[in-house]
């Protein structure tokens, strides 16, 4: 496993990878969680012939703080594509979670062709701009009740403790607390993420 930082228009991106001809490119959803740790249970199961690449977007995981004012989804897609080019990736499977579902739609139009797309709970424009007054996700009621009952941080801590080894769980929380502290100390005009519009 190697870690590098790639300088892009949206800021420096922390990239974790193990190079092979065929690559699994994993992109996180919103939140502070580092991508490598978030996808570690999948990455551990890959055969040695398949490499992997995870990218921490600005202000998440191991990537440094960088103001995203004036940035948008196209800028983020261009930044991810720059990482693919820099690492000379020519064949890849894209594995996205949540908000990166929208990003996947942009990446699929780029010249380096994606062989397959695996979308885990993808967010799409239809989901982002949906009317939630009719509760379109009844299966999430229990999850929302638990979050309300114990608070989001405790709920998430319990979830990561059940999912990850003690070592990885500790590293996840150390990184998230460090990033959270950095973000709390920023000016009020600082923009954490780029804009996503209906276009």
How would you label these PLM feature ranges?
Residues 9-62:
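Conserved HGGG/HGGXW glycine-rich cap/lid loop of the alpha/beta-hydrolase fold
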Residues 36-38, 63-69, 128-130:
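Conserved catalytic-core motifs of eukaryotic protein kinase domains, centered on the activation segment
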Residues 41, 106-107:
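Active-site signature of alpha/beta-hydrolase-fold catalytic machinery across serine-
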Residues 54-93:
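Active-site loop/oxyanion-hole signature of alpha/beta-hydrolase fold enzymes
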Residues 94-96, 120:
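Short beta-strand immediately N-terminal to the catalytic nucleophile in serine-hydrolase-like folds
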Residues 96-100, 104:
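Gly/Ala-rich beta-loop-alpha elbow adjacent to hydrolase catalytic centers
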Residues 109, 115-149:
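Flexible "cap/lid" loop of the alpha/beta hydrolase fold
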Residues 128-131, 147-199:
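Conserved alpha/beta-hydrolase catalytic His-Asp/Glu region
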